[in-house]
Amino acid sequence: MPESKYRQQTIRAPRGTVLTAKSWLTEAPLRMLMNNLDPDVAENPHELVVYGGIGRAARNWECYDAIVDALTRLEADETLLIQSGKPVGVFKTHDNAPRVLIANSNLVPHWATWEHFNELDAKGLAMYGQMTAGSWIYIGSQGIVQGTYETFVEAGCQHYNGTLAGRWVLTAGLGGMGGAQPLAATLAGACSLTIECQQSRIDFCLRTRYVDEQAATLDDALARITRYTREGKAVSVALCANAADILPELVNRGVRPDLVTDQTSAHDPLHGYLPSGWRWEEYQKNAQSDPHGTMQAAKRSMAAHVRAMLAFSKMGVPTFDYGNNIRQMAKEMGVENAFDFPGFVPAYIRPLFCRGIGPFRWVALSGDPQDIYKTDAKVKEIVAEDKHLHHWLDMARERIHFQGLPARICWVGLEWRQKLGLAFNEMVRCGEVSAPIVIGRDHLDSGSVASPNRETEAMRDGSDAVSDWPLLNALLNTASGATWVSLHHGGGVGMGFSQHAGMVIVCDGTDEAAARIRRVLHNDPATGVMRHADAGYDLAVECAVEQGLNLPMVAATQGKG
């Protein structure tokens, strides 16, 4: 690895109200960049890796230093441009323009392959930004807990009469994203068995209470699951092993889970999925010396993994892909029916997307957990009738360990995001919280992503692969005045399979911030309603009418028919 991609340095975002940069609008991206690399947040901060295989916050350490320097000196009417983790320019714009514009991992489609990307990465010409790693709004595993929780709850409604009590989930992967699964299952009332090949990741999840227990062997794990489900307890169990070995063994034994999914880093066969029979150190070494052979070995193991998932599905066990592209990898290795089980979005989440409901998250730049608890109370006050949301916030406060700067996530839609943002801004203005708050989201949202094997799988009109939508989302957020806007490629599912956009806006208590919040936090989720209404979803059309959207080709929004 080039020296510039490794540095033995501990980074933590500043806390409190003393500015390092010239304003809160530049202090915010500076703190969030640093927060992404906090050792309590990032998977491998010394190599700038935040999560998701090789999802990095900056291209190399020289680029990181230059970004920090640029943000520190950036004026109120200037915009910093980031090209795949490298600061390439500062330009005069205006006060309401974004302070940072980010483009990560974008390749011309014909060349959008892991092989070509890895060549560029090795030359220092590119960086994989994942979704929130390179866009500086990662908040640790909490960032996906509620989405996973909502998925499990909906699965319980569809398959088990509304409850997962006495049921168990079989899955794999305890990285930055997958680590949310066991806690989400517990919060949804289910037991879970999560297979993870790296003991260090299990240790982290045990320490942060995302996992309750570790089993010594498969027999021990199954005995625990049997006991807890019989007792009606929701307990999460981790097992250090390879999913490509364990799932086929469970099929051979005739073991029948109640839900099966997966969140290994299968999207990146060179860095994210340990081939069966290999040690992790061997995998890392071979990735350098024989990348093609390593990728093929990983994909062969994925094929075995998916065949086992297909076997569970054939047994009648609800089985779904949780967005890591493992079905595609298996299909490339000859598993022709890999897509016989669905992805989680068409199976459980799309009705939420139709209403612009998605992962709304915010971070207290003060570093004070009390600021988050106060905003939790404000959300309950404003969204007063949503008891499901209140239950989520109560559970989150009790069970979720803050990683880095205190943060919260809750899934809310077009109707509420603007109202919550304005309320948070007012809390900053009147001193109810001790410092500004940033509001962002995952790129996994209703209008900000094109990903035919994940968020846009099986769209009603067949527009799964149309990536105009995330481009329009990024352009509109830029025009609306988001504090920083990002446009990425390959997040979640790997090179060639997705394009997606993100935005973050700062609530600094000013009238100018309030005006930007009104635009951004309405327009951003509205693009999701627009995208789904355009695809012919009645629920999205109804939401568009209710919220007064002007969609020229959707007759109902024009007062016709």
From Swiss-Prot:
The active site is at 410. Keywords: Cytoplasm, Histidine metabolism, Lyase, NAD. Its cofactor is NAD(+). NCBIfam families: hutU, PRK05414.1. GO terms for biological process: L-histidine catabolic process to glutamate and formamide; L-histidine catabolic process to glutamate and formate. One of its GO terms (cellular component) is cytoplasm. SUPFAM superfamilies: Urocanase (SSF111326). It comes from Salmonella dublin (strain CT_02021853). Coiled coil: none annotated. PANTHER family: UROCANATE HYDRATASE. It is found in: Cytoplasm. Its main location: cytoplasm. NAD(+) binds at residues 52-53, 130, 176-178, 196, 201, 242-243, 263-267, 273-274, 322, 492. Catalyzes the conversion of urocanate to 4-imidazolone-5-propionate. Its EC number is 4.2.1.49. Pathway: Amino-acid degradation; L-histidine degradation into L-glutamate; N-formimidoyl-L-glutamate from L-histidine: step 2/3. It comes from the Bacteria. Belongs to the urocanase family. Pfam families: Urocanase, Urocanase_C, Urocanase_N. It is an enzyme of class 4 (lyase). Binds 1 NAD(+) per subunit. This is Urocanate hydratase. It catalyses: 4-imidazolone-5-propanoate = trans-urocanate + H2O. GO terms for molecular function: urocanate hydratase activity.
